[in-house]
C-alpha cells in the first residue's frame, strides 16, 4: 500500500520509506473509553459500569443486631442542566445527577437469641447521591467554570514482586525480599535478615518471624515443615541409621562416604555419583544406605516422637537432634523417625531459623497471656505488632488476622493483582478471588527462598509489566468507593446507637451523601491529578490529556523518587515517549504515551508489532504488553526493506529483552510497526529528530506546547506528517460527520448536505469565535471550505487556532541566516527583520477576563452604576448608563471598566436628612468608589461583556439589551436551520417522486403529465406544501406511505428543533445562580494584540531557543543576490556545542521547498496556453523524488480546478513530510537541490545590508519553522514608582501581581559597598525601602522640585527591637545621649 499525497486538506510530499499499515489510534481514546466504562451513559444495560461495581462492593449494609439491612438496587444518571459554554460563563460545574435506588428491609427477630425470623417490612426509595462531573466532548471537565483535565496515573501494579537489595548493616551482603502489594489493604513483606532468618512484616511495622504468620493461620509445626522441606524417613536397625537410596539426592559431589547397610563403602566422599553407577547399584538390589551420624546431628524432627507404651509425646516436631536424644530413642525402642531435610537442593535453613527465632517471644507471651495454644499466641503476637498497647483476646486476634488479608471489604488485589500473582507463582486461582489465599502466602514464601538460592527470577519494579495506568474512570471509582466507605461507617455508627422502634425509618434517614460529595469535589478541585488544562494550543491540550504521572495519591513523592524510577527503561519502547518529559524536579516522573500505544483492559500499556513467520513479515498486527514481549525477538524498523516490505538482509538488528543484537531474520517473531512508534506526539512533530541530541529534542518537544496561536500562522514547509493527526484528534477544528456537498458557509455556521444510506441529510455545524482559553489565548474557528465543495466524512471543514488547512500550524516559515549580526545575536539572542513585524507574522491576540461583584453588605447593598463620586465626566464617557464599559472601547491602564459604589458604614441618618436625600438624590458623601479599573500594563479592545443578576433584583438596561441581542441571534439561527430542514425535506420528496411513474394524469405548473410518466424534478421546485398533498395522490400507495413517513419524520425533527430553541431561550431568561451575598456579577473581556517585541522568547523545533534582541529595518538586514532580504539572523555558535543538527537539515529542505515554490509561481505568471499541463508535470516531477507515493496517478487524475488550488498552496513553498528516523536522505537531498537549482552545500552569497558589501564567506541560508512562545515580555516587564507596602516591615511588596518593587538583596548591597557608593546605598536602604517618614518627605520634595532631605531611621530597626522584646530582652531606643549616661 502506497502512502497518500494528502495531508489534511493539502498536498505534502511524504518521504516515508515504509508504507503506513494502520491509522494512528485516536489520541484521546484512553480517557474517553475509561470514563465511558465508568458511567456508561449511552448503554441500555449499565450493570457492568464502574459506578454499579462500586455500589455493589459496599452494599448491602447489615445491622449487627439483625434489626435491618440496607440494600442497593440500581443507579440512575440524569441529564446535564446547562451546556458546557454556560457552565464556563456562569462558574458552574458541568455535571449529571447520580441517584441510587435503595431498599430498607426490616427483620422480625427473636428477642432472646437476636436471630432473624423473617421479613417484617420492605421500603424502597430513590436517593440523590450527588452531581458527578461529566466529561465534555473534548475529554476535559468543567469544575466551577474552569476547564480541567484529570491526568492518567502510572502506579505500581498490585501483585507480588521479588527484589534483592544491598544490606545497610552488614557489608555487601544481599538481602532478599518479597512483597505482596494489594490495590487496597495491608502490604505484606517477606525479608531475610543478615543471619538468614526469614521474617514477615505488615505495612512496614515491626518484623516477626515468618512462621508466626503461618501459625496464626492455623498451621501446626509439622504442617509448616512438610510445606517447605522434603521429609527424610530414618529407620533404626542395629544402632545404624538407614534411609532409602534415592539417586536424585546426590546430584553434586558427595560430602560423605556412601555406605550400604552392611557397612561397605560404595563411593568415597568428594566423588560424583553418575547415573550409570546409580543404575548399577539399583540393579544390584541396593535399597537402603546409611545416614551418617555427623550429618544427622543438628537436624530437626519433622514429626513428633511418641512413647510406644505410654502414648506420651517425647519429642515434638522441630526438636533438634543430638546424641542424648538418639540414645533415648534406641533405649525405648523407637524403630523409625522423620527429619526435615534442610540440606536438600533448593531449600535452606531459613524456616527452621524462623522457628528458633519465634520460640522465645512465644514463651514470653505464654506466661503473660496464660494461653497454651501456640497458634492463638501467634495471632495475638501479630495483633500486638499492628496495634501496640491495646488489650486483646484470642478470638479478637484470630478475627483481626483474618480481616487483614481475607476480608473482601478490607483487602482487594483486583483482577489485575490476581492475574499477576497467578502468572508469577504459577497458581490457578480463579480471577474473581481478589483476596489472598493461604496458597498465595505459602507460594510467595517458597519463591523468596528460591530467589535466595539463585533459582527464582528477581523482578524489576520499573518494568512496564509491573506498572499500570489508572485512568479517569478508575480514579473516580476509587474516590466514590472511599466516600461510600465513609458513608457505610456512618450508617453502622448510627445503627449501633439507635434504639426503640424502627418502623418509621426510611432509607434517607440512614444515608447521608455528604461524605461522597466532599471526597469527589476534593478530587476534582484539589487533587494532584486534576490539573488546570493547558490550552495554549491544540498540541499542548492533546499532550496534557495523554500525560502519565507517577505522582498523586498512591503514587510516588517527587522529593523521594530515585534515579531508577525516572530513567528510560527498555520496556518503554513503543509505549512511553523517551523524550517528552519536563525539565526540573519532575523529570522522568511525568511522561507521555507513545504515538501508537494503547492501554488494555487491565491498565497495561501495549505496543503494536507486525507478526513475522519464517522470516517473512505478514500483514497481521498485534498489540503486546511488556510482559508478553519478554523473550521475543523483534526486528527493528531501521533494517532495510524491499518493495514488498520484506527484509533485504539475512542478519537483522533485533531487540531481545532490551538488548540489541544481530540475529538471523528467520529467528524473529515480530517486526516494529513503524519507525516513529518509539516517541510521543510532540517529539514526532520534530523533523530530522534523529540528528538532534536527546536533551535538545526534549526542549523542542516541550517548547512546541508553549507556542502561542498567531493571527497569520502557516503550516510548516518541512513537516513530519504527524501534523494532520493532532488536528484530526483535537476538538478545536470542526470535522464533517457525513460526506456531502457544502450548502452554506459563513463566519458562524456551515451547512453540509450529505447522504447516508441513500437518504439526504443537511448537517449543521456552528462555529465559535473570540473565546478565551485557560491561558488567555484567543480561540476562534474559521471555515476552510466553499459553497458547492465536496467534503468527505471526517474531513476538517473549519480550522481552529494554530491550524492551517486541517494541519497543525504552530509558527511561521522564516528565512534564516546563520551568521553574527553586529554582536546582537550573542548568547542565543535573535535578530529579526522589521518586515516580519509589518506583515503581522508573529502577532497574537490574547483575551483577558476582568470581573467585579456587587455584594450585599451589613450596611447596605453595593451598586453597579455610572454615578460615581469624585470622578470627572470625561473619565466616565466610555461607560453606558448602567456604568458598564461599551463593547468596542479601546482601553488603557487606569480606565474605569465597571463603575461600582459601596455604602460607607455610617451613622443612621435623621429623618430630615433622609427626606433631603430622597428629594435631591444626595448620595455622594455616603458611598465610596469601588470601581473596577483596567490594570496599568493592559491595553486592548473590549470584545464582550457578561452580566449576571441575582433572582429578585431588577435587571439593568444593559442586561436587557444584551439579552435582546442574544435572543435575536438565536431566532436568526433557528430560522436558518428551519429553512435548511425545509430544503432537506423538499430534496427528499423530489427524489422520492422522480423515481416512480404516475398512476393518474396530472398537471404541474404549465407541464402536463400522463399516467406512466416520470416527473421532472425541476417542475417540483416551485410547488408549495398544499399543492404537493394533491400531487401525491397521483402516485401508488407505496409512494404515498413513503411520503407520509418522510413528512412525519420532518415534523418530528422540526418539533425537536423548536424544543431545543425554546430550551435555549428559557436558559437565557432563567435567573442566574450566584454565590451567597452576591447581587450582580459582571465579566469584561478585553482582547489585546501583541506584536513581536524585543524581549519576547522564540524557538525552533529543535530546542534552539532565544530572546529577540533587536528588530532591524528591512533595508539593513543582509540580502541575497536577487535582492531578497533575510528575516532572521541566528548565531552559528548555537549549533555545534548543542548538537542539534536537525535544524540545519530543516533549513536546507525548507530552502528547496521555497525555491521550488518560486518555480511554480513562474509557471503561473507565464500564463501560456497549456500552463496547467506544465504545472501538473512540474508538480509530478517534484513529488516523484519521494519513492513511496503514487504521485503521478493522484495528480494526473486531479481536476484542473483542484490542481490550481493546490498549486497556489505550493507556490508559497512546496510542503514536505520528513518522518522521524526515515526522513530525507542524502540522495534525495541531491535530487531536490538539482530540481531547485541550488548549490549542493546549501550556502548562499550574502551582501551586508548596511554597506552593500559582499560578505566574505558564503552563508548558510534557508527556511526554518519558528515559533513565538508564551513567555511574552509584555506580561513580564513591570515598573513602579510608589505603591503598596508590606504591613510589618514597611518595605515595598514584591512581584508584578501585587504591583511590587524591585528587590535589592544582600548581594546587591555588597556590590554597592564594593564600589564605595555610600550615598546611593543609604538611599536604597532608607527612603527607597522602609524609612516611612523619609519617603513621604522625599515624595513631597520631588513634586515641589526641591532637594531631597536627609533620610531617617528605617522601620527595620523598630521591627528588630520588637522582635528582641518578644524574646524578653528589654531594648529601648533613645533619640539622643543624655549627659549623665
From Swiss-Prot:
One of its GO terms (molecular function) is DNA binding. One of its GO terms (cellular component) is DNA-directed RNA polymerase complex. It comes from the Bacteria. GO terms for biological process: DNA-templated transcription. Its EC number is 2.7.7.6. It is an enzyme of class 2 (transferase). It holds the Pfam family RNA_pol_Rpb2_3. Belongs to the RNA polymerase beta chain family. This is DNA-directed RNA polymerase subunit beta.
Amino acid at each position: 500500500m502506497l502512502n497518500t499525497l494528502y495531508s489534511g486538506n493539502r498536498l505534502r510530499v511524504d518521504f516515508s520509506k515504509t508504507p503506513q499499515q494502520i491509522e494512528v489510534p485516536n489520541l484521546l481514546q484512553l480517557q474517553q473509553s475509561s470514563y465511558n466504562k465508568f458511567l456508561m451513559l449511552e448503554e441500555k444495560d449499565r450493570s457492568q459500569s464502574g459506578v454499579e461495581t462500586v455500589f455493589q462492593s459496599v452494599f448491602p449494609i447489615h445491622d449487627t443486631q439483625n434489626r435491618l439491612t440496607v440494600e442497593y438496587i440500581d443507579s440512575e444518571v440524569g441529564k446535564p442542566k446547562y451546556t458546557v459554554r454556560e457552565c464556563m460563563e456562569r462558574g458552574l460545574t458541568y455535571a449529571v445527577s447520580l441517584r441510587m435506588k435503595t431498599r430498607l428491609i426490616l427483620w422480625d427477630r427473636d428477642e432472646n437469641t437476636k436471630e432473624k425470623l423473617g421479613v417484617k417490612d420492605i421500603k424502597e426509595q430513590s436517593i440523590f447521591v450527588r452531581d458527578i462531573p461529566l466529561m465534555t466532548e473534548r475529554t476535559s471537565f468543567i469544575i466551577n467554570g474552569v476547564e480541567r483535565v484529570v491526568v492518567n496515573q502510572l502506579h505500581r501494579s498490585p501483585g507480588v514482586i521479588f527484589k534483592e537489595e544491598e544490606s545497610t548493616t552488614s557489608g555487601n551482603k544481599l538481602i532478599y525480599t518479597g512483597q505482596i502489594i494489594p490495590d487496597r489493604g495491608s502490604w505484606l513483606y517477606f525479608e531475610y535478615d543478615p543471619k538468614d532468618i526469614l521474617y514477615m512484616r505488615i505495612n512496614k511495622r515491626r518484623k516477626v518471624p515468618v512462621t508466626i504468620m503461618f501459625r496464626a493461620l492455623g498451621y501446626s509445626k509439622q504442617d509448616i515443615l512438610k510445606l517447605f522441606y522434603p521429609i527424610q524417613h530414618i529407620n533404626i536397625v542395629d544402632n545404624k541409621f538407614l534411609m532409602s537410596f534415592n539417586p536424585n539426592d546426590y546430584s553434586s559431589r558427595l560430602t560423605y562416604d556412601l555406605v550400604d547397610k552392611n557397612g561397605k563403602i560404595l563411593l568415597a566422599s568428594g566423588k560424583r555419583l553418575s547415573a550409570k553407577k546409580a543404575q548399577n547399584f539399583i540393579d544390584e538390589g541396593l535399597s537402603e544406605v546409611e545416614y551418617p551420624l555427623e550429618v544427622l546431628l543438628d537436624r530437626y524432627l519433622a514429626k513428633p516422637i511418641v512413647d510406644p507404651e505410654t502414648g506420651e509425646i517425647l519429642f515434638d516436631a522441630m526438636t533438634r537432634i543430638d546424641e542424648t536424644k538418639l540414645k533415648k530413642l534406641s533405649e525405648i525402642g523407637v524403630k523409625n523417625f522423620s527429619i526435615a531435610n534442610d540440606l536438600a537442593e533448593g531449600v535452606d535453613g531459613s524456616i527452621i531459623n524462623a522457628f528458633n527465632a519465634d520460640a522465645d517471644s512465644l514463651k514470653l507471651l505464654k506466661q503473660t497471656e496464660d494461653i497454651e495454644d501456640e497458634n492463638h499466641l501467634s495471632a495475638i503476637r501479630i495483633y500486638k505488632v499492628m496495634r501496640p498497647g491495646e488489650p486483646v483476646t484470642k478470638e479478637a486476634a484470630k478475627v483481626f488476622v483474618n480481616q487483614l488479608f481475607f476480608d473482601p471489604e478490607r483487602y482487594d488485589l483486583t483482577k489485575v493483582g490476581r492475574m499477576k500473582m497467578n502468572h508469577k507463582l504459577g497458581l490457578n486461582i480463579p480471577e474473581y478471588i481478589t483476596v489472598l489465599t493461604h496458597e498465595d502466602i505459602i507460594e510467595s514464601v517458597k519463591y523468596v527462598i528460591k530467589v535466595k538460592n539463585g533459582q527464582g527470577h528477581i523482578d524489576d519494579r520499573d518494568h512496564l509489566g509491573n506498572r499500570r495506568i489508572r485512568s479517569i474512570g478508575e480514579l473516580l471509582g476509587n474516590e466514590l468507593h472511599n466516600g461510600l466507605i465513609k458513608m457505610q461507617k456512618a450508617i453502622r455508627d448510627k445503627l449501633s446507637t439507635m434504639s426503640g422502634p424502627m418502623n418509621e425509618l426510611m432509607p434517607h434517614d440512614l444515608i447521608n451523601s455528604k461524605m461522597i460529595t466532599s471526597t469527589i469535589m476534593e478530587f476534582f478541585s484539589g487533587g494532584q491529578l486534576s490539573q488546570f488544562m493547558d490550552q495554549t494550543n491544540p498540541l499542548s491540550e492533546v499532550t496534557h490529556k495523554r500525560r502519565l504521572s507517577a505522582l498523586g495519591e498512591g503514587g510516588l513523592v517527587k522529593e523521594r523518587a530515585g534515579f531508577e524510577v525516572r530513567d528510560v527503561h527498555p520496556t518503554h519502547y513503543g509505549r512511553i515517549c523517551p523524550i517528552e518529559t519536563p525539565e526540573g524536579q519532575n523529570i522522568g516522573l511525568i511522561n507521555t504515551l507513545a504515538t501508537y500505544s494503547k492501554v488494555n483492559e487491565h491498565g497495561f500499556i501495549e505496543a503494536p508489532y507486525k507478526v513475522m513467520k519464517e522470516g517473512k513479515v505478514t500483514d497481521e498486527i498485534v498489540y503486546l504488553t511488556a510482559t508478553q514481549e519478554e523473550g521475543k525477538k523483534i526486528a527493528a524498523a531501521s533494517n532495510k526493506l524491499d518493495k514488498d516490505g520484506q527484509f533485504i538482509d539475512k542478519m537483522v538488528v533485533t531487540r531481545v529483552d532490551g538488548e540489541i543484537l544481530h540475529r538471523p531474520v528467520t529467528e524473529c517473531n515480530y517486526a516494529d510497526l513503524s519507525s516513529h512508534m518509539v516517541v510521543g506526539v510532540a517529539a514526532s512533530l520534530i523533523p530530522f529528530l534523529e540528528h538532534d541530541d536527546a536533551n535538545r529534542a526534549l526542549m523542542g518537544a516541550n517548547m512546541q506546547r508553549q507556542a502561542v496561536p498567531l493571527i497569520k500562522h502557516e503550516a510548516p514547509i518541512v513537516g513530519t506528517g504527524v501534523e494532520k493527526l493532532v488536528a484530526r484528534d483535537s476538538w478545536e477544528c470542526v470535522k464533517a460527520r457525513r460526506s456531502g456537498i457544502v450548502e452554506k458557509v459563513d463566519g458562524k455556521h456551515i451547512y453540509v448536505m450529505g447522504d447516508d444510506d441513500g437518504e439526504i441529510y443537511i448537517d449543521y455545524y456552528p462555529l465559535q469565535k473570540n473565546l478565551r482559553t485557560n491561558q488567555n489565548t484567543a480561540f476562534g474557528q474559521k471555515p476552510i471550505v466553499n459553497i458547492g465543495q465536496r467534503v468527505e466524512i471526517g474531513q476538517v471543514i473549519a480550522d481552529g487556532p494554530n491550524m492551517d488547512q486541517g494541519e497543525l500550524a504552530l509558527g511561521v516559515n522564516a528565512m534564516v541566516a546563520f551568521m553574527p549580526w553586529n554582536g546582537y545575536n550573542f548568547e542565543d539572542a535573535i535578530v529579526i527583520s522589521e518586515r516580519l513585524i509589518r506583515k503581522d507574522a508573529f502577532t497574537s491576540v490574547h483575551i483577558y477576563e476582568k470581573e467585579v461583584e456587587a455584594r450585599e453588605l451589613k450596611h447596605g447593598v453595593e451598586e453597579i452604576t455610572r454615578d460615581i463620586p469624585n470622578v470627572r465626566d470625561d473619565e466616565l464617557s466610555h461607560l453606558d448608563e448602567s456604568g458598564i464599559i461599551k463593547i468596542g472601547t479601546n482601553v488603557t491602564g487606569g480606565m474605569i471598566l465597571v463603575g461600582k459604589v459601596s455604602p460607607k458604614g455610617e451613622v443612621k441618618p435623621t429623618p430630615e436628612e433622609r427626606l433631603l436625600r430622597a428629594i435631591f438624590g444626595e448620595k455622594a458623601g455616603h458611598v465610596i468608589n469601588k470601581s473596577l479599573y483596567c490594570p496599568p500594563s493592559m491595553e486592548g479592545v473590549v470584545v464582550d461583556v457578561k452580566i449576571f443578576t441575582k433572582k429578585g433584583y431588577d435587571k439593568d438596561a444593559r442586561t436587557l439589551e444584551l439579552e435582546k441581542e442574544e435572543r435575536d441571534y438565536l431566532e436568526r439561527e433557528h430560522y436558518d436551520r428551519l429553512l435548511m430542514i425545509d430544503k432537506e425535506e423538499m430534496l427528499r420528496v423530489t427524489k422520492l417522486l422522480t423515481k416512480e411513474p404516475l398512476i393518474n394524469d396530472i398537471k404541474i405548473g404549465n407541464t402536463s403529465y400522463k399516467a406512466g410518466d416520470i416527473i421532472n424534478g425541476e417542475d417540483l421546485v416551485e410547488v408549495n406544501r398544499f399543492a404537493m398533498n394533491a400531487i401525491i395522490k397521483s402516485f401508488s400507495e407505496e409512494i404515498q406511505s413513503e411520503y407520509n413517513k418522510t413528512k412525519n419524520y420532518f415534523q418530528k425533527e422540526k418539533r425537536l428543533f423548536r424544543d431545543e430553541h425554546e430550551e435555549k431561550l428559557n436558559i437565557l431568561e432563567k435567573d442566574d445562580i450566584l454565590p451567597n451575598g452576591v447581587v450582580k456579577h459582571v465579566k469584561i473581556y478585553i482582547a489585546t494584540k501583541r506584536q513581536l517585541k524585543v524581549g519576547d522568547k522564540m524557538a525552533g523545533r529543535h530546542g534552539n531557543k532565544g530572546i529577540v534582541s533587536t528588530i532591524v529595518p528591512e533595508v539593513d538586514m543582509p540580502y541575497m543576490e536577487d535582492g531578497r532580504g533575510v528575516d532572521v539572523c541566528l548565531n552559528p555558535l548555537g549549533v555545534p556545542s548543542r548538537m542539534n543538527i536537525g535544524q540545519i537539515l530543516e533549513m536546507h529542505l525548507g530552502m528547496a521547498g521555497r525555491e521550488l515554490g518560486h518555480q511554480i509561481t513562474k509557471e503561473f505568471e507565464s500564463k501560456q496556453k497549456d500552463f496547467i499541463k506544465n504545472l501538473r508535470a512540474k508538480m509530478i516531477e517534484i513529488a516523484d523524488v519521494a519513492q513511496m507515493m503514487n504521485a503521478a496517478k493522484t495528480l494526473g487524475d486531479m481536476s484542473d480546478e483542484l490542481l490550481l488550488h493546490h498549486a497556489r498552496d505550493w507556490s508559497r513553498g512546496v510542503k514536505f513530510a520528513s518522518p522521524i528516523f526515515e526522513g530525507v536522505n542524502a540522495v534525495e537531498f541531491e535530487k531536490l537541490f538539482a530540481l531547485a537549482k541550488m548549490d549542493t552545500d546549501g550556502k548562499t552569497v550574502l551582501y551586508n545590508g548596511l554597506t552593500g558589501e559582499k560578505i566574505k564567506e558564503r552563508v548558510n541560508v534557508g527556511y526554518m519553522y519558528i515559533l513565538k512562545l508564551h513567555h511574552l515580555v509584555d506580561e513580564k516587564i513591570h515598573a513602579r514608582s510608589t505603591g503598596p507596602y508590606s504591613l510589618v516591615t514597611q518595605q515595598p511588596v514584591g512581584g508584578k501581581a501585587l504591583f511590587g518593587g524591585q528587590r535589592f538583596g544582600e548581594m546587591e548591597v555588597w556590590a554597592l559597598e564594593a564600589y564605595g557608593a555610600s550615598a546611593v546605598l543609604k538611599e536604597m536602604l532608607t527612603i527607597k525601602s522602609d524609612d516611612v517618614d523619609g519617603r513621604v518627605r522625599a515624595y513631597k520634595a520631588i513634586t515641589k522640585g526641591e532637594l531631597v532631605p536627609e533620610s531617617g531611621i528605617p522601620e527595620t530597626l523598630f521591627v528588630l527591637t520588637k522582635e528582641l522584646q518578644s524574646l524578653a530582652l528589654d531594648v529601648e531606643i533613645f533619640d539622643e545621649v543624655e549627659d549623665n549616661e
